[in-house]
């Protein structure tokens, strides 16, 4: 017969067993979210590629990677078509045009060999893989600082955001490397792991000519949150900001005038006065912006509705916590400032395009640090209910927006008038296009509309 003490011990053992089982389930929650995200995103990306829903930018990056793989570094005739020499001067596109004058992206060379292994599927694999890996590193950041449940909720919120899903389903972008670089650098800073710190800090500005701004933001955050490390903070600020200045004013003009005469004009032409077509350097634009404070304030808040929706869209999956976190504004503030001040044919405040990757890491980290500093860093039942509703709403808004027509096989592109092609018809369309391309001689020059560009690149 068991006495009362034996029963108590047995009950305690059972409780401990249940707690360990629950802990294991929670620990696996982030891996399940990452796996589901990767499978769905990659499946949709491959479907888009087959049915010709990938766009011009996808073709550019495939061409750049393929040419670089064969020793023609960063060359792209597709990028030449968009250059200022063609658009403004009326010249013909140039086969040997080097894209570094438009965007300075040395880290693309890391992924060029994969094009020889996976072919056209390489870039979707890289994009989905990097974004998924970033989520796993985010969990590695959160796990020692938050209860298991909160860490898992945070990672699920990261993967459920329209601001992450939308651009992941779009054309390949060099900015898909940014979230992983940010989280790796933060892991190195928080755990004093110098190898990760150096790797993240060195690679981040090399992703694109403007990503050094994120490094400046991290340096500012370090100055505020860890003042005893002010020397390291100043090094990060100097390296990130200095690289942006040198890259845009010295290195890129060596290849072309596209940055000053096209991108600065398209994105910040409203600050350049009566004759913006003359162009300006990044330093010149910065001077013009801050010399017009009334216009600056107007651009920051106008249009107010779109600006507010943009912030709410980023913060919705995190239950709006990033909006009240100082860390968010320190880490994402400089990027938000640039987006709010910019204009362009690609709306900088669209929640489903590549520019959101400049902001997503700051919002995720802002939520993480906010929960870490709470006396009770675990959401209660009511908060979990509200958070679950926010996650559901975020996913619902993402699906109904049909980002980059990724879900066009199950939902119409237009209701009035009704425009929808069945999956079978889309599949046969892609098959027919590939059959048609087989008759083109290998040495022939080719002109094509946008859906065929990735196939020909």
Language model: regions and residue ranges:
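Short acidic/glycine- and proline-prone juxtamembrane loop motifs at membrane-interface regions
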Residues: 166-175
